[in-house]
Amino acid sequence: MNLKTGRVLKISGPLVVAEGMEEANIYDVVKVGEKRLIGEIIEMREDRASIQVYEETAGLAPGDPVITTGEPLSVELGPGLIEAMFDGIQRPLNAIKAKAGDFITRGVEVHSLDRDRKWHFTPLKKVGDTVEAGDVIGIVQETSIVEHKIMVPYGIKGTIETIEEGDFTVVDTVAKVKDKDKVSDLIMMQKWPVRRGRPYGRKLNPVEPMITGQRVIDTFFPVTKGGTACVPGPFGSGKTVVQHQLAKWADAQIVVYIGCGERGNEMTDVLNEFPELKDPKTGEPLMKRTVLIANTSNMPVAAREASIYTGITIGEYFRDMGYSVALMADSTSRWAEALREMSGRLEEMPGDEGYPAYLGSRAADFYERAGKVLSLGSEGREGALTVIGAVSPPGGDLSEPVTQATLRIVKVFWGLDSQLAYRRHFPAINWLNSYSLYLEKISPWMDENVASDWTALRTRAMSLLQEEANLEEIVRLVGIDALSEKDRLKLEVAKSLREDYLQQNAFHEVDTYASLEKQYKMLKLVLFFYDETQRALNAGVYLKELLDLEVRDKIARAKYVSEESIENIDAIFNELSEVIDELISKGGIMNA
């Protein structure tokens, strides 16, 4: 497309204003200056275009050429996404390193997907079959655990004229589809504009929980497959570790991890850990199901906005294949700060704390692309895209605009508490402030698939923790001696729930992940201890004797029982019953 070349009129950090751009459109990608820096038009006024440049603008000068490509910012979708690491505008970092060295050179142009690598394509359709947008015509075994489904692109339908098995690159024709007189070549790669959500058949009601292996989340504040959640918390409260834990252990088939404006070391941790950690379901390295988007704090600010959209478009693509996808965005506050900076340079009217007035609608555009859907196509595939965004409110102030805009949209809130973090209680999710609006939808699934009394146990445990908070107020005022033995027992059981159940060590090889079966048995064990000790108290046994029982140590160590030895927890139930029976039979006099 030969479009007229514009000229740079003004440069203000990542914002460039160009004139002579009357042939361009809003959101077109442009190449700025002699080095052809990548930018995107975000505002048009007559022949002037305001461009946010995704690379460092130092060295640009008024009068430099600006060439529009005539296309919106798009991502390439096809085999080669899994195990790859991209920057915010989907440039593969490995390819950039091979071409330009360890540092990203300005204006470097590389294809998002490798044009030389060949993939083995196995057709699932044959000549003469009728296909429509979204139909799977063949598969590519991308990694040992991900089967990449090659779908008919949106807008194409007809009858297959040719299709063949073999080794192809992502730009080789693998099939031809004829519709009336028009013949379309199908390749293994699609392009899709990042700011436009990928189409689907219809949205479905999410009812199945996304199992994370984190007890406080799965038991008290679960998120569904296709749900939305946010993790706000002050600095040092463990947001990134929570995000890493979810990326490691969530039972999603694909994980998209976006490091948006956070420290580079955190992405390095992911790169070092994921190839070595094994997926509990498949036994394969976690990296074989992961796409990484690294847009660290020292990369250009404008690209932070693009990285969020790049990541969710890749997530939607795998969702359309029928996969359950989990997307982690760490942190959406940095993305909002990028919006604020661009809004300030555009001289727009500021909203709360300088953020643009459209912050809420932009956040909604992002989170509303999550969901469980029936994909396009005749097969009726169901896919889910779960979005979990970290929010970094300055000073932990949850009333600031980004947190409030996010809370209006998402249905799960995992509030991280600096006080819990200072007490070394991790994950530092405050059980009194956090909530999940999916509980009613998930409870029937849990009762059916885990245990019939799961919901009842969860409700009892939550009420104990809330009663503990009330009793602690009394203890602070008049001291623990003013409490009855039954209330003191409640405090001890709530402490056991906090320390033996909710606390979880992300860096312990066993405690880092707990299956639902193990979570159920651990929770039931703590509440069984409460029931049995209440029975003993009513029979006249002294509270001190009950609290000194050796079996309490075994309850505390239940979290370190491996998944293969879960039956060992059952033995603690029997031992506890026997000890309590013996105490009662001796009238409460026993050296336990």
UniProtKB/Swiss-Prot annotation:
Do you know which PROSITE patterns this protein is assigned to? ATPASE_ALPHA_BETA (PS00152)
Q: Which UniProt keywords apply?
A: ATP synthesis, ATP-binding, Hydrogen ion transport, Ion transport, Nucleotide-binding, Translocase, Transport
Q: Which GO terms describe its cellular component?
A: proton-transporting ATP synthase complex
Pfam families given in the database record: ATP-synt_ab (PF00006), ATP-synt_ab_N (PF02874), ATP-synt_ab_Xtn (PF16886), ATP-synt_VA_C (PF22919)
* Function summary: Produces ATP from ADP in the presence of a proton gradient across the membrane. The V-type alpha chain is a catalytic subunit.
Q: Which HAMAP family match?
A: ATP_synth_A_arch
For this protein, the record's PANTHER family field holds: H(+)-TRANSPORTING TWO-SECTOR ATPASE, V-TYPE PROTON ATPASE CATALYTIC SUBUNIT A
Output this protein's name: V-type ATP synthase alpha chain
